[in-house]
Every structure is written in C-alpha cells, then in structure tokens.
C-alpha cells in the first residue's frame, strides 16, 4: 500500500516522532506527502536537503520554538502560539500535526497550515491528557 500511495490518489502523512534512521526515512520519502518529525534545529539542514529531492512537505516541530516546513527547498517558519499556563503537553504534537495536515488539505497554504497546527497545539496545552 505504501508504494502505491502517490499513484492511487490518497495522501500519506507519517509522524516519525523521534525516529532517527535517516537512510530508512529517505527510502520512504518518495511515497509520502507529509513527512513530520519532532526535533531540534540541528535536523533542519538534512530536511532541507531531502525537500530538494522529494515532492513532500517536510515538517519539523520544535516545541515551544515553533515549527519549520520545507517544500522544494523553500523554508517556512512559524512561531509557537504562546500559552500562559501549560497544563499538560500530552498530545500536543499530534494536535499540531492533525491541524497542519487538515488545514493544508483544505487550503493548500503551507504557512496557514502551520499557524492552524500551532493554534490547535496551544489549545491542547491548556488541558489534562491528550485533547
């Protein structure tokens, strides 16, 4: 199924979370539409490089530092939405990714999708447990 994703018309989003086998990730990149990972600034050069090679949105969540998305070598950055009182971070990244993917699928606007993801993640931070 993975290897038919680009030709079958459905979109594939994968959250690699903290997985760091870059050779394996690159092997899968041609079949994905949304490549998402949680990480740090040091990952950015690798994902910019991958975005120049594969037709996929590469999104790196940097927690309170916001997020970065690469598409065809172009970089997009959005700051995290400030939250006065953080109750629980459980599910925050998942909420961000859901908002990002849904917004992009509806609007086809990378920066807007990143802002929507950040807003939904900020709301999740205000509640106990995955929200």
For every predicted segment, state its role.
Residues 47-131:
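Conserved phosphate-binding/catalytic region of the ribokinase-like
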Residues 6-77:
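Conserved phosphate/ATP/ADP-binding segment of small-molecule kinases
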């Amino acid at each position: 199924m993975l290897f038919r994703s680009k030709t079958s018309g459905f979109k594939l989003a994968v959250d690699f979370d903290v997985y760091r086998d870059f050779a394996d990730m690159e092997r899968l990149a041609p079949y994905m539409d949304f490549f998402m990972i949680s990480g740090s600034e040091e990952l950015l050069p690798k994902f910019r490089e991958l975005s120049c090679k594969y037709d996929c949105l590469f999104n790196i969540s940097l927690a309170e530092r916001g997020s970065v998305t690469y598409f065809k070598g172009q970089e997009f950055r959005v700051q995290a939405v400030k939250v006065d009182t953080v109750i629980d971070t459980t599910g925050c990244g998942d909420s961000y990714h859901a908002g990002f993917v849904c917004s992009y699928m509806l609007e086809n606007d990378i920066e807007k999708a990143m802002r929507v993801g950040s807003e939904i993640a900020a709301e999740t931070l205000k509640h106990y447990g995955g929200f």
